[in-house]
Curated annotation (Swiss-Prot):
Signal peptide: none
Entry's EC annotation: 3.6.1.7
Name of the featured protein: Acylphosphatase
Lineage: Bacteria, Bacillati, Bacillota, Bacilli, Lactobacillales
Organism: Pediococcus pentosaceus (strain ATCC 25745 / CCUG 21536 / LMG 10740 / 183-1w)
Keyword rRNA processing: no
Length: 90
């Protein structure tokens, strides 16, 4: 099990990116959250077994939204956290 903090930049707002990231997380049973930042990036914290989280990260890199595009994705390991769901923060 591992947890990461991610920041995605590119065409990631106003394209359904948060919603489709949540759908991907729910399908893979990843816990955490996703939210838009005022600077136009999208921030994500996610936790899952190692192989599942790697698959989730790959899905985010490829943009879960067909209208989106991730130009840069930073991924940093963070401590494990409590949570059973993946939510969209506003």
């Amino acid at each position: 099990m591992k947890a990461v903090h991610m920041n995605a930049s590119g065409q990631v707002q106003a394209v359904g990116f948060r919603y489709t990231t949540k759908l991907l997380a729910d399908r893979l049973k990843v816990t955490g959250w996703v939210k838009n930042n005022p600077d136009g990036t999208v921030e994500i914290e996610a936790q899952a077994p190692d192989a599942v989280l790697d698959q989730f990260i790959d899905g985010v890199k490829a943009s879960p939204s067909p209208s989106g595009r991730v130009n840069k994705l930073t991924v940093k390991s963070i401590p494990l956290f409590e949570g059973q769901d993946f939510i969209v923060k506003y």
